[in-house]
Regions:
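N-terminal transmembrane-helix/juxtamembrane module of multi-pass inner/ER membrane proteins
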Residues: 1-42, 77-103, 184-203
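Membrane-helix interface segments
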Residues: 25-27, 56-61, 125-131
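Alpha-helical transmembrane segments
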Residues: 35-39, 65-66, 111, 128-132
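Interfacial segments of alpha-helical transmembrane regions
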Residues: 46-75
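Transmembrane alpha-helix boundary and packing residues in multipass membrane permease domains
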Residues: 46-49, 77, 119, 167
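Short helix-capping/hinge motifs at transmembrane helix termini and TM-loop junctions
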Residues: 53-54, 83-85, 147-151
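Small-polar-interrupted transmembrane alpha-helices in polytopic inner-membrane proteins
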Residues: 66-81, 130-143
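Membrane-embedded catalytic cores of phosphoryl/pyrophosphoryl-handling enzymes
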Residues: 98-203
Length: 203
């Protein structure tokens, strides 16, 4: 349709404006690759830190963020199966500086997960941590377009999917989120009883 053609033209134009080239300084490309590949590790570090900090509220938030993140990635899988959208390098557009499988580009899993976590934290009133994750999310979105493995609209899709997952997650949470959290706390306390007893971890 003319509308979709206009969207794709805009998508390609913005991509080419943001995408690195062989003339781009090597340090900037290296920074882009580093952010694109490894900034996502903030998610497990943050969730584990939230859990280990102790307190039912923080642990419930860690479980809720995990639930929303998994929901968002699940939605992405369904979209990827239902509609294949080639990555830039798969159709010879721009320059690529990171080896990647030619699977569907839309939406970006990295940006979806980071958006889902940041939205969950912000909706729970954790403004500082939520904004930190959101700033990493923006950096990752830029980096993955910059190094040529995603389109700008893959990032727009990520925000939409993450928002949808947050809404679904809050509905599911009301049906038994705290019950699941309490069950996980019980398992944690039993599995790590010795370590908790030695006061190396918070109960």
């Amino acid at each position: 349709s003319p509308f979709m053609q206009a969207i794709e033209t805009l998508n390609r134009t913005v991509f080419l404006a943001l995408n690195a080239s062989p003339a781009t300084p090597e340090w900037l490309i290296a920074a882009g690759v580093l952010i694109a590949n490894y900034a996502i590790l903030l998610v497990p570090v943050l969730l584990v830190s939230l859990w280990l900090a102790g307190g039912d509220e923080r642990r419930a938030l860690a479980v809720r963020a995990c639930l929303v993140g998994l929901l968002a990635l699940g939605i992405n899988q369904v979209i990827g199966i239902a509609w294949y959208h080639p990555r830039p390098f798969a159709i010879g557009v721009g320059h690529t500086f990171l080896a990647h499988a030619p699977d569907s580009s839309f939406p970006s899993d990295h940006a979806t997960l980071l958006s889902a976590i940041s939205f969950t934290l912000l909706s729970a009133g954790k403004r500082r941590t939520g904004l930190l994750v959101l700033s990493v999310d923006i950096a990752v979105a830029w980096a993955r377009v910059f190094i040529g493995v995603h389109w700008p609209f893959d990032m727009v899709g990520a925000v939409i999917v993450a928002s949808l997952a947050c809404m679904l997650g809050s509905t599911l949470w009301r049906f038994g989120g705290m019950t699941v959290t309490r069950a996980l706390i019980t398992v944690y306390r039993k599995a790590l009883a010795m370590t908790i007893g030695e006061r190396w971890l918070r109960p």
